[in-house]
Amino acid sequence: MKKTLLTTLSTFALMALLSACVPSSTESTAAKEGDSSAASVESTAAQTGESSKTVDENLPKIGVIQLVDHTSLNIIYDAFSKELVELGYKDGENVIVNFKNAQGDMANLPTIVQSFEADKQDVVVAITTPVAQAAMSLTASTPVIFSAVTNPVEAGVVSDLNTIDKGMTGTTDAVNVDKIMDLAMTISKDAKTVGYIYNPGEDNSVSNLAALKEYASSHGLTIEEASISSSVDLQSAASSLAEKVDIFFVANDNTVAESMPVLVKVANDAKKPLYVGADSMVMDGGFATVGIDYTDLGKETARMVDQVLKGKKVEEMPVKVFKDDLYTYINTDTAKTIGVEIPESILSDEKFVEIKNKK
């Protein structure tokens, strides 16, 4: 069954996600599980200051660390918050939720982690690979549930997906590079050169580049790389590749995702399809991907936190992989902008999700 999502091309406002009633960032005419009417859990510690609400400090504490404010991660936290409500948690009444955002600066992570250690959180949620790696220092005393860690083994946070021996487990947003590139080769049949932009400081992006190179070597493709250290480098990196490549591919790099509109404009102006690693990046104007629903990722993260608060050990919970829950997301407005036709075989597939920009 085809789904259609209408989406804006702007990043969620973080404070909107923390409000008591959060409107959905997308409108779906056929969502997998229906629209949730649950309000988000309000954080007792917003990123810019402490809440004035008086709470019982003896309540269980959930510390949440988010790396940066961008669509993918905001979807995860929004879904996480709503699922906590569905599970019976209400901030300030039977739980305390402490949310911190590193504002895209990894140098902020040690300070946040140390503050959570001092405050004795009962469980910490680490959203993204860099955050999970920074939170490893907590695991001697505090269970950690990570979310959106692309390759937990390579990141060093678990020995393997079923052997939880480092004090943390969670959910992975592993990018299926092969399936995304298969989609690219189906739609962009004449493509020979792929432009890949990434931050080499993000292990998730490095591992995805390795997978892309492996695919390229067996399919006769050439990879043109451009590395960036911050989102301000994205414009020049994308522009430098635009004349050299037939298509762009960016995985789930947080530095890129933070400034997706910049990359989208360069790609669209050059009429080059931009294949991406997350559904949310298609919502931000990217052309297409094959991947998971990040809402599911946030919900499952909340369920794992619930299990920890009820006494289950993280060692008893394997990493959750969404390998069978993949959808093909295509922004049909972007397709029109760059003049690309989508094969009927894709449009009629029950796993096809059409993304349209909200007018």
Stretches found by the model and what they are:
Residues L17-A20:
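C-terminal motif of bacterial Sec signal peptides marking the signal peptidase cleavage site
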